[in-house]
């Protein structure tokens, strides 16, 4: 379609010469079920005065979703933004003149106009021989040095021809840099007003919110907030918003259709279980229609939840203590005791109880004392698990009653904890992703030239000498020994 001749070529020529093609968008391969071929979107206009065509290569922007590739919301927004603004973006889009297309005989194959491939890795000959980090490769990280002017000098020492990096812990140097810390603080300040704005937009009257319109409006506001922050990709921020919006929009739909009181609704948790060989739907506890039980427990019933978690931790500790007891036993004792399985890695509950009963109150050896202690721990676990089950059931009932009795202010606070707090935390992590990316690149540069060609040759020479020495210990017939002597000579052995 984009480059074949014949009638297809004539169609392309007519569309180009009549200014009907506004944009050609190349999409990733394998995004449609059942076909792995790359696809394109051609944006056509009946009347255009522009003599340029926007060509977009979005083939690298996707995530894996099982066997298929999937466009994320941020990928779609990236495409929409460049097409709406008719904008050239390096390695993504380019405005191509009709004259250039004519010169290419109306061939519209996207790689002819937009090169989205990764730059090939290069190796500096001087640094490969003498070590150090080439200045040209350090300067490729210019966007970071522009954002954090003092960092390059802290990381690299100029030795004239190359840079030297003397730091073992690159991450600490980067994170402690004053400009980097100022960057984190500045970004945090830029988005600090978002929770207040989201409370006003979403939480005050959630039953009246236009979900689709608000996502668009919030996206624009978020974009404006971080517009002055270097390095942070606004499309990454938008993706965080869209990821959160999936759950938020479902809640807004429920509240919009049922009213604010739906926030206090609790429904039977229906699950499918096998009964008499058939799938039967039965109730398994309760779930909040809008507010998850675990959220309510964490925010309003913290003491009850903490008590259960403490018991859970104790059960795990007991498991470790029992394992330690087993590991401390002599192998002969393990093999001669019915209280321990044949593999020696677990107790046999019934036999352990019999053995402890037979031991009585006065164990005569370390092994018997270990068995008694293990039984005590098993008894404690049984009691704890029974108590945990009782506490969980009581907490579930208490959570159900708490949700039903929520005041409007409590309900709004919980909506904020569900919708806004996690999103804000996700957004606050974006600078750390940028910093981690630079740390990875600097470490890669340092390691790339850490071993010089002379070092490699020396290692090879040492390995050859070691191998030649080992060959001298081999024996065989005269024919084999002659071959080994020749190999030793090739390796430089005597």
Regions found by a protein language model. Give the residues of each.
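A conserved structural/catalytic subdomain of Rossmann-like adenosyl-cofactor enzymes
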Residues: 1-286, 314-317, 327-330, 334-494
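Extended alpha-helical interaction scaffolds
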Residues: 288-289, 295-296
């Amino acid at each position: 379609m984009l480059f074949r001749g014949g009638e297809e070529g004539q169609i392309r020529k007519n569309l180009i010469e009549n200014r009907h093609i506004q944009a050609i968008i190349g999409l990733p391969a394998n995004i449609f079920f059942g076909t792995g071929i790359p696809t394109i979107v051609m944006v056509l206009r009946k009347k255009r005065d522009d003599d340029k065509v926007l060509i977009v290569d979005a083939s690298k922007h996707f995530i894996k979703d099982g066997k298929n590739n999937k466009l994320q919301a941020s990928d779609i927004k990236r495409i929409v933004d460049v097409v709406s603004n008719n904008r050239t973006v390096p390695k993504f889009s380019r405005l191509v003149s009709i004259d250039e297309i004519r010169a290419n005989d109306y061939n519209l194959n996207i790689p002819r106009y937009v090169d989205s491939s990764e730059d090939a890795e290069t190796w500096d000959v001087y640094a490969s021989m003498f070590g150090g980090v080439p200045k040209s490769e350090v300067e490729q990280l210019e966007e970071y040095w522009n954002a954090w002017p003092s960092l390059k000098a802290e990381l690299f020492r100029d030795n004239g021809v190359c840079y030297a990096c003397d730091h073992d812990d690159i991450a600490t140097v980067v994170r402690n840099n004053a400009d980097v810390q100022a960057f984190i603080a500045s970004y945090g300040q830029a988005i600090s007003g978002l929770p207040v704005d989201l409370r006003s937009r979403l939480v005050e009257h959630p039953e009246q919110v236009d979900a689709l319109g608000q996502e668009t409006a919030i996206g624009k506001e978020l974009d404006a907030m971080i517009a002055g922050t270097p390095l942070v990709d606004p499309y990454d921020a938008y993706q965080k918003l869209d990821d959160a919006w999936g759950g938020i929009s479902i809640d807004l739909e429920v509240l919009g259709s049922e009213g604010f009181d739906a926030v206090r609704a609790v429904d039977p948790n229906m699950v499918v279980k096998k009964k008499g060989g058939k799938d039967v739907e039965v109730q398994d506890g309760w779930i909040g229609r809008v507010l998850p039980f675990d959220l309510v427990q964490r925010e309003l019933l913290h003491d009850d939840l903490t008590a259960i978690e403490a018991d859970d931790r104790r059960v795990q500790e007991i498991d470790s203590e029992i394992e330690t007891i087993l590991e401390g036993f002599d192998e002969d004792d393990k093999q001669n005791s019915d209280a321990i399985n044949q593999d020696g890695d677990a107790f046999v509950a019934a036999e352990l109880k019999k053995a402890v009963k037979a031991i009585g109150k006065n164990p005569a050896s370390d092994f018997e004392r270990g068995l008694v202690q293990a039984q005590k721990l098993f008894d404690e676990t049984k009691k704890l698990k029974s108590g945990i089950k009782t506490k969980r059931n009581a907490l579930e009932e208490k959570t159900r009653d708490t949700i039903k009795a929520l005041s409007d202010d409590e309900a709004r606070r919980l909506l904020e904890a569900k919708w806004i707090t996690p999103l804000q935390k996700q957004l606050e992590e974006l600078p750390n992703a940028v910093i981690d990316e630079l740390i990875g690149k600097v470490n890669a540069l340092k390691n790339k030239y850490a071993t010089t060609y002379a070092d490699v040759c020396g290692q090879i020479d040492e390995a050859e000498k070691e191998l030649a020495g080992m060959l001298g210990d081999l024996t065989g017939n005269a024919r084999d020994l002659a071959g080994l002597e020749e190999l030793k000579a090739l390796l430089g052995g005597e």
